[in-house]
Curated annotation (Swiss-Prot):
<dbReference type="InterPro" id="IPR009000">
    <property type="entry name" value="Transl_B-barrel_sf"/>
</dbReference>
<dbReference type="GO" id="GO:0003746">
    <property type="term" value="F:translation elongation factor activity"/>
</dbReference>
<dbReference type="InterPro" id="IPR050055">
    <property type="entry name" value="EF-Tu_GTPase"/>
</dbReference>
<dbReference type="InterPro" id="IPR027417">
    <property type="entry name" value="P-loop_NTPase"/>
</dbReference>
<protein>
    <recommendedName>
        <fullName>Uncharacterized protein MJ0325</fullName>
    </recommendedName>
</protein>
<dbReference type="GO" id="GO:0005525">
    <property type="term" value="F:GTP binding"/>
</dbReference>
<dbReference type="Pfam" id="PF03144">
    <property type="entry name" value="GTP_EFTU_D2"/>
</dbReference>
<dbReference type="GO" id="GO:0001514">
    <property type="term" value="P:selenocysteine incorporation"/>
</dbReference>
<dbReference type="InterPro" id="IPR004161">
    <property type="entry name" value="EFTu-like_2"/>
</dbReference>
Length: 308
């Protein structure tokens, strides 16, 4: 089974149900579409723009971005800024008939999205295009599965939902639940409600786990058989938001998002682009993962993005 995760951005009201069957829905909503041995999961940031977190989670979950634009509005600015600050260059704009294409091209000309394709709002064609997209995967590396949802199922026990970011996970694998020291065994694997003995990078999975309860889990925890870094204090070079109207100072409280982990933090030191943060709790990450510093209550919510 080949899997792809597509982020839906912009004017997405009513879009998900045109592209797939509605699945799990919390602050993000998943829509699933399957054709033969290929499956696409579309992610919609349901609670955005009220909350910034779903937008960042979606960016960190996806392989490909679809940005729907009915008209060029101010609200679109934060979404385009986030995609650019994360360096997203794999995606397409889906434009309505009244969108000024020259204006759009001008807006994105200096961004990571400058080479995005421009598509018409034809859902049949979009579905076909997405199901046939090829994404480079690491099937042989260590297993890495960030948890986006988890719950208890009677007679099954603890179940987590997530995307296999890398490697191949198999039934009976023992995986560490980062950032904790706890281990969990994979009892069973489901992909789109079908049982499998293994799942590879790109697949969205439901894993039944032995050895851990839902009380011990949090969104963003990572199942892995590799060596991830765990930290409660972080020094990082940040690319600051060019539209930010304030200076981040020592002693201030913010929030960071790394992968699907969201943690409060205090600024310990700031020296131009270099920042030292003390976190409320430990996070797990891989070298190269992105950290997003946010101020959820401010007008400009995304303060900066840096590479760990």
């Amino acid at each position: 089974m080949e899997g792809l995760t597509v982020g839906l951005f912009g004017h997405v009201e009513g879009v998900g149900k045109e592209l797939g069957k509605k699945g799990t829905s919390t602050d993000i909503t998943l829509y699933n579409y399957k054709q033969g041995d290929k499956a696409v999961c579309y992610v919609e940031p349901t609670r955005y723009p009220d909350r910034i977190n779903p937008l960042i989670y979606e960016i960190n979950m996806m392989d490909y971005a679809l940005v729907f634009i009915d008209e060029i509005t101010g609200e679109l600015g934060e979404t385009l800024l986030a995609l650019d600050m994360f360096g997203i260059n794999n995606g397409a704009f889906v434009v309505g008939e009244y969108v000024d294409l020259d204006m759009l091209k001008n807006i994105i000309s200096q961004t990571s999205m400058k080479d995005f394709e421009i598509l018409e709002r034809d859902f049949i064609n979009i579905r076909e295009k997405m199901i046939n997209l090829n994404i480079e995967r690491d099937y042989n590396g260590f297993v890495k599965i960030p948890i986006d949802h988890y719950f208890t199922v009677r007679s099954v026990g603890t179940v987590i939902l997530g995307k296999v970011e890398s490697g191949t996970v198999r039934v009976h694998d023992n995986l560490r639940v980062y950032p904790t020291d706890k281990m969990a065994m994979v009892r069973s694997i489901q992909i789109h409600d079908n049982d499998f003995k293994e799942a590879k990078a790109g697949n969205r999975v439901g894993l039944a786990l032995k050895g851990i309860t839902t009380d011990e889990l949090d969104r963003g925890m990572i199942l892995s058989n590799g060596e991830l870094k765990v930290a409660k204090e972080i020094e990082i070079n940040i690319n600051w938001n060019p539209f930010m109207q304030k200076t981040v100072k020592e002693g201030e409280n913010y929030q960071i998002i790394v992968g699907l982990q969201s943690v409060s933090c205090v600024v310990e030191e700031v020296n131009k682009n270099k920042i030292k943060l003390s976190l409320q709790k430990e996070i797990a990450y891989d070298v190269g993962d992105k950290l997003c510093l946010i101020d959820g209550s401010a007008k400009i919510r995304i303060l900066g993005v840096g590479k760990l």
